[in-house]
Amino acid sequence: MLLLLLPLLLAAVLTRTQADPVPRATRLPVEAKDCHIAQFKSLSPKELQAFKKAKGAIEKRLLEKDMRCSSHLISRAWDLKQLQVQERPKALQAEVALTLKVWENINDSALTTILGQPLHTLSHIHSQLQTCTQLQATAEPKPPSRRLSRWLHRLQEAQSKETPGCLEDSVTSNLFQLLLRDLKCVASGDQCV
């Protein structure tokens, strides 16, 4: 009889104390299956071609405007590998969000069709990054490192200091670094060294 009551008593004690049978840090939330960032290790040739066409059209438009920008917001020296693996999705999410925001605000009817597919792809990537970073924050909340904080602050600050044309130039110049290097690195997780 005591053997039958022991599991019930143990369950009652664990429930009453709100103890977890497995430590939280090792358990993934149920929604974790919704994080599918690994699918972006490489984009399809069709998607890359659409981005190449959009980049070319935007660069041509900027040249016609004779845009002069003193610096690039997103430095070529910036490398996500400098961050801890778990911080990389947050940094990439900020880059993708900025690219989306800038490209969505381009008011040129000639570019509407050209930007359609790239904007759709960037939106999909951004939504996956949001899901992954939210799940990660829930599973293991940690404050961001100083390096990540500085980078995120710099991106935020540039949005208020830079002209729309220079922001456009910067995110467009950084596009293939974002798609081919940064996205692949985040999608590869701890295999990106």
UniProtKB/Swiss-Prot annotation:
The cellular component terms of Gene Ontology attached to this UniProt record, alphabetical and capped at eight, are:
extracellular space
Question: Which Gene3D superfamilies does the record match to this protein?
Answer: Interferon lambda
Quick one: signal sequence residues? 1-19
User: Would the keyword Iron turn up in this protein's UniProt record?
Assistant: no
Q: Which cysteines are joined by disulfide bonds?
A: C35-C132, C69-C166, C185-C192
Molecular function per GO: cytokine activity; signaling receptor binding
- Identify the main location: secreted
Q: Which family does it belong to?
A: Belongs to the lambda interferon family.
The name of this protein is: Interferon lambda-3
- Keyword Secreted present in the record's keywords: the answer is yes
Instruction: Give the highest taxon in the source lineage.
Output: Eukaryota
